[in-house]
Amino acid sequence: MEKRPLQTSNAANIPSKTIEEMYQKKTQLEHILLRPDTYVGSIEKHTQNLWVYENDEMVHRAVSYVPGLYKIFDEILVNAADNKQRDPSMDSLKVTIDPEANTVSVYNNGDGVPVEIHQEEKVYVPELIFGHLLTSSNYDDNVKKTTGGRNGYGAKLTNIFSTEFIIETADGRRLKKYKQVFSNNMGTKCEPVITKCKASENWTKVTFKPDLEKFKMAYLEEDVVALMKKRVLDMAGCFGKTVKVELNGTLIRFKSFRDYADLFLKCAEKSKPMPLPRIHAKVGDRWEICISLSDGQFQQVSFVNSIATIKGGTHVDYITNQITTYIMNKVNKKKKDANVKAHTVKNHLWVFVNSLIDNPAFDSQTKETLTTRQASFGSKCDVPESMLKDVEKSGIVDTLLSWADFKQSKDLKKTDGTKTQRLRGCKAEDANEAGGRNSEKCTLILTEGDSAKALAMAGLSVVGRDHYGVFPLRGKLLNVREASSKQIMDNEEIQNIKKILGLQQNKEYTNVKSLRYGHLMIMADQDHDGSHIKGLLINFIHSFWPSLLKVPSFLVEFTTPVIRASHPNKTITSFYSMPEYEAWKERLGNSATSWKIKYYKGLGTSTPQEGREYFSDLGRHRKDFIWDDELDGNAIELAFSKKKAEGRKIWMRNFEPGTCRDHEAKLINYKDFVNKELILFSRADLFGSFKKKLYKEIKVAQFIGYVSEHSAYHHGEQSLASTIIGMAQDFVGSNNINLLKPNGQFGTCNLGGKDHASARYIYTELSPVTRCLFHEHDDKLLEYLNEDGKSIEPNWYMPIIPLVLVNGSEGIGTGWSSYIPNYNPREIIANVRRLLNGEELVPMDPWYKGFRGTIEKSAKEGGYIVNGTVTEIDEQTFRITELPIRKWTQDYKQFLESITDGAPNVKDPLIEDFRQNGDDAIVDIEIKMKPEKIATILQEGLFKKFKLTSTISTSNMHLFDAEGNKKFDTPEQILEEFFPLRLDYYEKSKEYILGNLNRLLLILDNKVRFILGVVNGEIIVSNRKKAELLIELKEKGFTPMPRKGKSTKPQVAGANDDDSEEQEDAEPETASQSVSVEGATWGDYDDLLSLPIGTLTLESVQKLLDEKTEKEKEYEILSGTPTTSLWLKDLDEFEKKLDELDLKYAEDDRKRASQGSKKANGFASKPAKKPPQPRKNTKKAKSVEPENDNSSMEIENAVEAAKPAEVAKPKGRAAPKKNIQKEPEDDIQSLQERLAAYNIESSGEKSQAMESEEVQQKAAGKKQNNKRGGAKKKSSTIVLESDSDNEVNDVDDDDDDFEEVQQKAAPVKKGGRKPAAQNAKKAPAKAPAKAPAAPKKRSVGTKQSAGQKLLTDMLQPAEGTGTSPEKKVRKMRESPFNKKSGSILGRAAAAKDISPIADCSAGSASNTPLSEDEVVEIAPQPARARPQRANRTQMKYALSESESEEDSDEDAELSDFEEDDD
């Protein structure tokens, strides 16, 4: 057809055609010949790098072939292979390729094609399946087949593209042999020739002559023949030894698929220095795998039902993904910064896969890529663990690590610096000559922070700016040896240092000529953090440019003094280390006191003037680092490389305290820096609690400030807050014994404590059990650390049992990681008793307070399996009531959501729904499973499927013992290590107490003799010179008792007064005060000469003699008590406290159960589950707060004294028994002493009467509270407990001083109640018999707090109270109602939110006798709906004789409503 000139070839520009010419119908045969690429692939010649078989070996080379021709050969070959799946007895496959005759024949034995006429198609079956399109035996998809045929084309395509096609088959069952010839592209067929055969004959043979003209070829070319031969070898590899495969009469011998893969690997090894690995595995009957390594590009050879999938597919991905995931995790675990992805691992693998897949699907008729989904494979192939480990050991991990290093180096090169004179975009004070001709003379000073930069800038005024530059570091430099390339790339400090110095990545430096600076000076604080910064900088240079450290004077250090001593004569001495200072002080002896000492914590302590002084004497402060040998590099790696972890542990163990480098030396080699400076390391919350005497609650935020001040804590408030909160947490999985009380929201098991409130809103105080664990007598015996000349917290504490076993430990330190589970404190106590009694220890297993699951030993040494709790409600519904330790409720809820039907991105849901019925402390989750998943879940295991099991290991118990780090294999080893050290401290404690008692006896003896001497006139004190009096006292044999000098020990609880800070700042003694005669000083007799005049009486002498007798008896008892008995007594006391805690927790659980709201209806039809039972207690005990007494024996007596007073039992029902707790105070005075101090007359009879009245009032109040009915109103009495005279007001404004005492309300219409004495006569105290407690009518947990009752009473009118004025008494101290933070209204409002712990720990009233000077009563008033301002209750007090009426009125008129709210 002619086209119009310069026109397109669309239909409009071509001469018109007839309809018949435009729209044609082709037969299927014509269509195949017209569009062959749809069926057999391209019929054009392609050139591609492929594997071919020639000269008896596999060769990978460029091959020129026609894909269509290769495919028609492959179809016949796959047909023969399919017969193996239909008839496993097939054992022979023979292929003949004759290029000269252009003939190919394929023979296989086994069941032949049935020689029988098809009843529907009326032709013989061989003709049907080889000469009719779309015929197949594979159309029934309900039947799972592992054959290659699928679409009904196959051999017909070979017939169509052949000039001659001959089918021969022998059917032994029918005793017929069949032969038929097709020609002319299946267009012509001859009649079949059928002859007889033997019954043993079963075979099929196909011979064809390709129509080379269709493939634009003249003959069978060499490349095509080589491909065909390789395809025959494929069959031999897939069959292995089950089928004998012959090619052109030669048997191909392969025993397994591995032998076949070996042909490829032998060829690849020719260009390799080392042989390639061959990792082979056969998984079931359907999968055979072989793995080797590739050169950065993924390679695969794979087969599906003997079909060569040259482009892979889902079966290859299935195997490869398992291997890549495993190797990727291993590589990234070995080098966290590798950031290796799965595709990177894949590029280094060579995978061989031979598989049988049910009814396989491919991307096209050419069948180059399998597309069947993994779920439809018909079999699973989990790559064996042994094979994965062999792949890991094959060298692929090292290859990937090298690749990661190369990639990182390539990325880091992008941040290289250059030698330029002008530096831009960097926060550096650049030297004027940097990057220029004199750059080698320039020094870059790296300072620790901006404050140190200011000091360096002051020094530059001395040395000038031409050759000195300054750059401040923000915090510690990154440890580049263990950091990822992304971390290094994103680290601004590192990039700036590279730019300023002009460093180029991985460049070998033999000199500094190519750098912008010739020297790098480190100017850091002279403390452990400063040493670490220096080490990290050295590590940075050594990691990337180790050659630079060998350049002389490249790296230098600028040292500053840590202490400067100045003398009044203007002499100044500087010290660069603490040992140097200590040696100097020891040399000077007492004369050192004339020197003024200044500690330099950091460079910021130095003034600009001192900075200029430093730089004026630069040679004194500059130290050069030198490289001696490779030991220097090894030392740096030892300190910072993760690979050297084991060596670092040995290095740390060999450390000897007191080690330090010589600060006088001008040169420092790197190994000395690492081994003598960098190795030094340092450790304060419990100390602050003891020193603060934290027996009353304090806000955590305020406590943080106290701890920071008194323990020299330098690591940030947030870290300290986390530690304090962690010490107070008591939910399951946290502490078995919390050392601090959690008064507020300190976190729950919902989020593992992360849901705690801010430190600004929560309060804490010392737990009653803490001081039983850490005895006061040990405070003076511990070794205290020193910070800036101030003694701070102890180096370590000495509890009576190892606390690390009680609460466990987990963390990472320098060189070690450590994990120690929690253990039962009672089991630990029992084992300590066994050690004290010389018995064998009983093995201990992990134990967590409140945990209701199980902890069982596993087969692994030192391993335990932790299981939660799950119960079956019905066949479909289960209830989870406990999770494994440290698996938090919120996290578990997210897991359940990920397997719940209907949730987004859930592929295989296991449950229909779940419901949560628990609270902040209880786990209660109902799960409704999908019915079709129940069998699978139960088969695989309910605990495993729902992640209700975890493990605990005791194989990594590293701890610091008294000498340093040590590894323990069992908790019993820790106990055995602890025992002798603790026993030794009990011996020291006993000696210390006896020494104090002996000193006290001497003081008492001196006082008795002195007072008698003054009374009898033998010693005249008045109107005499001090020197004469000192001589007389010495001559009369009075023992000098020098005052103890100001202790360098910290002020711990009970050791010193709280005003110790004021004492430290006190003025030194004047000359008149420091009189000295014949070696005796005025202070030696201070106990005698400072006695008040009122004590110089015979009564005082008798009192002192009684006290002396008591102390002598105490001395005798203690000296005769074995050390082990002291420990046993402390253990008994500690166990009593544990009993009290258990009783409290049981009460909390009971309250929670009774107060809990009704649970939502569950999934099951069964009744709702009962609330969780309270924790099991081994023993009931009464709650007693700790006392600050002076010995173990006194503590035991205090426990007895603190028991509730006997209550006079009123008529009718007995009042319920009530635990009355006592607020812990130091040195509580008796009632008589307090009355005596205020000069108030008091008799025993009056005190007894008042005590009896108080007891009777409490009992009556309880009785009335239990009655229902609103006719009578309750009244409350506030008891204001007196603080000790020397107590310093705490931050909390003594909020805890208010306690409630129940009192029977007086009738409204009658007058005041009778005096206390009369009431006492009517209700005498009864004998101490235990009466059964009457049950309370109201529900648990609804008890009103003191604050709530006060608020109710305050809102009632003041008239007609009916309360006797005799009972309104004022406490003898400043009224607490004038304190802004202590308003009763505010406390009453706050009392509504009292936590359960606080509620249980606070008693209703003090159990000590109360005098009239201590009771304040607010009278009950008739209720009003809305009280008006004019009618508010006024506080009225009875006056003591020493107070004025005006003061009383002024105080009484201050209403709580006028107070400021805090």
Curated annotation (Swiss-Prot):
Entries under CDD domains matching the protein: HATPase_TopII-like (cd16930), TopoIIA_Trans_ScTopoIIA (cd03481), TOPRIM_TopoIIA (cd03365)
Transmembrane segments: none
Keyword DNA-binding assigned: yes
Low complexity: bias regions: 1198-1207, 1314-1334, 1419-1430
A GO BP annotation: sister chromatid segregation
Catalytic site: Y761 (o-(5'-phospho-dna)-tyrosine intermediate)
Name by which UniProt lists this protein: DNA topoisomerase 2
Source lineage: Eukaryota, Viridiplantae, Streptophyta, Embryophyta, Tracheophyta
